[in-house]
């Protein structure tokens, strides 16, 4: 294909196949990418930011282990450790996820190949991807660094996250899931606060979605700790669909709104301790069966019970009523939004299109919220000199 103006983005694959850092054509025309961006109905700021990222990305070239300098550890989980790193040849700061896998070379190469679809995932609601490679028993996935970290980290500092902020988060998650489904036929498979990243510019982006079936299979044993966000139908072994992502998406704002993982549901006494007042509604009522003695390992906050075993948690999710937001504290629209996400039967659960026009989302979309300002003051980040409101969410 002859080069056209503007200058094309170079995504060069490694010659030996150990680092497949580019697309199959080895060269993607910026003009074609810009055309794809136009299809996404982005505002001017979002388009400029995506183009800036893609322009930076062409400086990267082939990714090699020796080219990285570790700055700090950002977190661990989902089968890997994530570091903030400097890519010395380009000067870019990235997030590098290292996944240690004892696998055969053919499987490893298949995983690297499958990860290449991430080069095509360019959206304001998806974390940017620089490339993936294998070195010394570890697969490295190199991504855009989000300086606000993940929402589970933010929640630990905030205690609880306000409804207005969660409205902006919900919009970004719906738009991110819609983009993955409509443009790439991808389901996320692991929506939870730790996989929603934020930054000081007010952007909210999804990461760690299931593009590589082989990687999911290879890491199957390491997913035990995140199963608490799985939908009832996943535990029952029925067909997985995007509706399962909706359940996880509904559970996440409940956790962030009340300040702890909401299964088992907090009782009236605990809610009173949380919110400093008597709370009305179903969430404050005694559950139909005695509450299990434990809590999930992923819980934090006021719940001091011993951890709930995974089989107890599975039984609770499948057989007990789904979590709800307490009324009297949150708006009716927010409560209804969550309820529609957390319907046990996936066929009755709201879909992405229905959620996008839900009253809570419409209201949140219209609200002026300084997400960047809230985030920076909450976690002690310096705000950029040109702060943005809600980052075009």
Curated annotation (Swiss-Prot):
According to the UniProt record, one GO cellular component term is: mitochondrion
What topology does it adopt in the membrane? Peripheral membrane protein
**Catalytic activity line of the entry:** L-seryl-[protein] + ATP = O-phospho-L-seryl-[protein] + ADP + H(+); L-threonyl-[protein] + ATP = O-phospho-L-threonyl-[protein] + ADP + H(+); L-tyrosyl-[protein] + ATP = O-phospho-L-tyrosyl-[protein] + ADP + H(+)
Enzyme Commission identifier(s): 2.7.12.2
List every stretch annotated Disordered: 1-27
Q: Does the keyword ATP-binding apply?
A: yes
Top-level taxonomic group: Eukaryota
| Modified positions (Phosphoserine) in chain numbering | 218, 222, 298
RAF1-binding, as annotated region: 270-307
Q: Which GO terms describe its molecular function?
A: ATP binding; MAP kinase kinase activity; protein serine kinase activity; protein serine/threonine kinase activity; protein tyrosine kinase activity
Subcellular location(s) of the protein: Cytoplasm, Cytoskeleton, Microtubule organizing center, Centrosome; Cytoplasm, Cytoskeleton, Microtubule organizing center, Spindle pole body; Cytoplasm; Nucleus
Processing after translation = Phosphorylation at Ser-218 and Ser-222 by MAP kinase kinase kinases (BRAF or MEKK1) positively regulates the kinase activity. Also phosphorylated at Thr-292 by MAPK1/ERK2 and at Ser-298 by PAK. MAPK1/ERK2 phosphorylation of Thr-292 occurs in response to cellular adhesion and leads to inhibition of Ser-298 phosphorylation by PAK. Autophosphorylated at Ser-218 and Ser-222, autophosphosphorylation is promoted by NEK10 following UV irradiation.
CDD domains, from UniProt? PKc_MEK1
Keywords in alphabetical order: ATP-binding, Cytoplasm, Cytoskeleton, Kinase, Membrane, Nucleotide-binding, Nucleus, Phosphoprotein, Serine/threonine-protein kinase, Transferase, Tyrosine-protein kinase
* InterPro entries on file: Kinase-like_dom_sf, MAP_kinase_kinase, Prot_kinase_dom, Protein_kinase_ATP_BS
Where does the record place the modification Phosphothreonine? 286, 292
Q: Where is the Protein kinase domain?
A: 68-361
Annotated site residue numbers, Cleavage: 8-9
Question: What controls its activity?
Answer: Ras proteins such as HRAS mediate the activation of RAF proteins such as RAF1 or BRAF which in turn activate extracellular signal-regulated kinases (ERK) through MAPK (mitogen-activated protein kinases) and ERK kinases MAP2K1/MEK1 and MAP2K2/MEK2. Activation occurs through phosphorylation of Ser-218 and Ser-222. MAP2K1/MEK1 binds KSR1 or KSR2 releasing the inhibitory intramolecular interaction between KSR1 or KSR2 protein kinase and N-terminal domains. This allows KSR1 or KSR2 dimerization with BRAF leading to BRAF activation and phosphorylation of MAP2K1.
Instruction: Respond yes or no to whether keyword Membrane is given for this record.
Output: yes
Q: Which residues bind ATP?
A: 74-82, 97
Q: Name one Pfam family in it.
A: Pkinase
Task: Tell me the protein family, please.
Answer: Belongs to the protein kinase superfamily. STE Ser/Thr protein kinase family. MAP kinase kinase subfamily.
State the protein's purpose: Dual specificity protein kinase which acts as an essential component of the MAP kinase signal transduction pathway. Binding of extracellular ligands such as growth factors, cytokines and hormones to their cell-surface receptors activates RAS and this initiates RAF1 activation. RAF1 then further activates the dual-specificity protein kinases MAP2K1/MEK1 and MAP2K2/MEK2.
- Tell what the record comments on domains: The proline-rich region localized between residues 270 and 307 is important for the binding to RAF1 and activation of MAP2K1/MEK1.
Stated name of the protein: Dual specificity mitogen-activated protein kinase kinase 1
